[in-house]
Regions:
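Intracellular loop-helix junctions on the cytosolic face of multi-pass helical membrane proteins
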Residues: 6-11, 15, 37-257, 280, ...
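Transmembrane alpha-helical cores of Major Facilitator Superfamily
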Residues: 19-27, 267, 271, 305
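Hydrophobic/aromatic residues within the transmembrane alpha-helices of Major Facilitator Superfamily
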Residues: 27, 173-177, 271, 309
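Transmembrane alpha-helical segments of major facilitator superfamily
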Residues: 205-215, 265-277, 307
C-alpha cells in the first residue's frame, strides 16, 4: 500500500494516510477488551460461571498445590462461592480453567476469521491498486521498457540510508518494548492495586457507548470546522448535536457503580489514539502548508519524548 504514495502527487499525504491507517487499527483495539470479556462470559456461562480476573491465577496455583491451605485457599473458596459453586474447591478450579480455555480458542477463531475477511478484501480490491503492487525490480524493468533512465544509488548514498534505517529501527524497537510492557503491566496493576468499581465521572471511561459517541462527536466537530460545503457543515453539526444528546442519555442511565475488569483499562490508549488523530493530522497538515512539517524520524523522536514523559 505504501507504494501508492511513491507517486509525487500523493507523496506528501503518506504520513496522513498512515495516521488514518493506524487510527483504524486502534478502533479495533478500543473494542477488543470488551469483546474478549464478552466471549469469555459467553463461554463460561455454559458451565454456570462468569468472568472474574482474580480466579485464573489463583485456580492455577491451587491446582499446582491442591493441598494448600490458608490465605490462597480461603480466597479461592470465597470466589467460588460468588460463582454459586458449593462443591469441592479443586473441582471448581479445574472446571473454571477448562471452561475459560474454551474462550481462548473462540477468541483465536475470531482472529482467524478476521484474517480471512481481510485477505478476501485484499483480493477483491486488488485491481484498484494493481499498479502499485510491484517490486523494485519490476519497477526498474517497466522503466527500462519505457526507455526511462533508472537512477541507482551510489555506495555512499546506500550506506547513508542504511545507517538512517538502523537508527530508526533502534528507536522503534525501544518504543514498542516500552509500549507492550506498559500495556501488560497496566493490566496487572489494575488487577492487583486498583478498585474494581468506578463511580461518578470516571464511569464514562468504562462505557463503550459513551466513548464511541465522544469519538464521533470529535470527528463531527472537525468536519463542521474544516468543511467548506454548507450541506456538509449542517450534517456534521447535526451529528455533533446528536452525539452530545446521546452522551447525556447514556450517562444518566449509568448505574451508580460500574464494575471494572482489569483488561478494560487497555481501551484507554486506543481511545485516545482514535480521538486525537484528527488533531495530529490537522496540526501536521497546517505545518506542511507552511513548509514546516517535521520529517518522519523527527515525529518518531517527538513520540518517544512524549512516551517518556508519560
Amino acid at each position: 500500500v505504501g507504494n501508492l504514495y511513491d507517486d509525487p502527487r500523493y507523496s506528501a499525504k503518506r504520513d496522513s494516510a498512515f495516521s488514518i491507517f493506524y487510527m483504524a487499527i486502534n478502533i479495533g483495539a478500543m473494542y477488543a477488551p470488551s469483546a474478549a470479556t464478552a466471549i469469555a462470559n459467553w463461554q463460561l456461562k455454559k458451565n454456570g460461571f462468569f468472568y472474574d480476573a482474580n480466579i485464573p491465577s489463583l485456580a492455577n496455583e491451587f491446582l499446582k498445590n491442591p493441598d494448600a491451605t490458608g490465605d490462597m485457599a480461603s480466597k479461592l473458596e470465597v470466589l467460588a462461592n460468588a460463582q454459586g459453586w458449593t462443591g469441592n474447591i479443586a473441582d471448581f478450579a479445574s472446571s473454571y480453567i477448562n471452561s475459560l480455555a474454551g474462550s481462548y480458542h473462540m477468541g483465536f477463531a475470531v482472529a482467524c476469521f478476521s484474517l480471512i475477511v481481510s485477505f478476501a478484501i485484499y483480493l477483491g480490491f486488488k485491481k484498484s491498486f494493481k499498479h502499485a503492487d510491484v517490486t523494485s525490480k519490476q519497477q526498474a524493468a517497466v522503466a527500462a521498457a519505457k526507455g526511462e533512465k533508472v537512477v541507482e544509488l551510489t555506495k555512499e548514498q546506500t550506506k547513508q540510508r542504511i545507517t538512517a534505517l538502523i537508527l530508526v529501527f533502534v528507536v522503534v524497537i525501544f518504543f514498542w518494548m516500552s509500549f507492550h510492557q506498559n500495556g501488560l503491566t497496566l493490566t496487572w496493576f489494575a488487577r492487583d492495586y486498583t478498585s474494581n468499581a468506578a463511580e461518578g465521572l470516571t464511569r464514562i471511561g468504562f462505557s463503550l457507548p459513551m466513548m464511541t459517541c465522544i469519538v464521533i462527536a470529535m470527528y463531527s466537530l472537525f468536519s463542521t470546522i474544516q468543511s467548506t460545503a454548507k450541506k456538509t457543515k449542517l450534517i456534521s453539526g447535526g451529528v455533533l448535536a446528536l452525539m452530545v444528546i446521546l452522551c447525556i442519555v447514556f450517562y444518566t442511565n449509568l448505574q451508580p457503580s460500574t464494575h471494572i475488569e482489569p483488561q478494560l483499562f487497555q481501551q484507554f490508549n486506543p481511545f485516545f489514539v482514535v480521538l486525537l488523530t484528527p488533531i495530529s493530522v490537522a496540526l501536521f497538515g497546517a505545518l506542511a502548508k507552511k513548509g514546516k512539517e517535521p520529517s518522519t524520524p523527527k515525529k518518531i523522536g517527538l513520540g518517544m519524548l512524549i512516551a517518556a514523559c508519560g
